Amino acid sequence: FHCMTIDVPMFLDGEIKYVKFFEDDGIALREYFDFPVLGRVLLYPYPHPEQVTIPRHISCRQVTNKGSVLPERYYNLIRDMCRLGLAGLEPVNVKGTEVVPQDFSSAFIIRERDRILRETDFGDQRGCVSVVVRGKKGGQFREYRFHMASRSQALGEGTGIPAAIGAILLLEDKVEGTGVMPPEACINPGYLIELVSQVMPIDEKKEDGKSFGGIIVEEVDEKGEIKKLEI
């Protein structure tokens, strides 16, 4: 609910702007994206630090963050309850009983989750984190996509493995600067990619055989043709 009710920062046209999830400026940022493992998913504007920190360290015109929760029916339930005003914190009187709308909504959503997972035959957790970089190279349009996909976890591996790699780089004295910094300010991405090949063999030892999918890199040319790159 928090992500849908606060003003969402986005770096648009070279400056920080704040959009609202349910209003025209937020709706305009919704888009479908084809993920490895997940397939086509409708994404929504999502508040995150990258929109604020990346433009401070990398010259660019636009930085957005978008996301969703699977299965989509589950996310749609959360979205619709928030849109109906059931995310409020002020108690309301329901037949003589004081009820906090958000407390009711949270309990209802948790109750419905198992039913939705069962009816959609969702199966194991899965997830993907993707970074898309667009611009011009040699005067021609280029798009690069970096994906971290998992068939056995949601955001666990997409969050945990990069953080673990960051800790390794810190121990190896490959983190530049001091203090609190975002990754783009202190880590050479090449170091991270080098370590992925060391992490993946360890992850392959999972008993269920569903290992971390590693980093997938794709290039999209001016014709929209997608080519997978070896790293």
How should these model regions be labeled?
Residues 1-231:
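C-terminal catalytic/substrate-binding lobe primarily of soluble NAD(P)-dependent oxidoreductases
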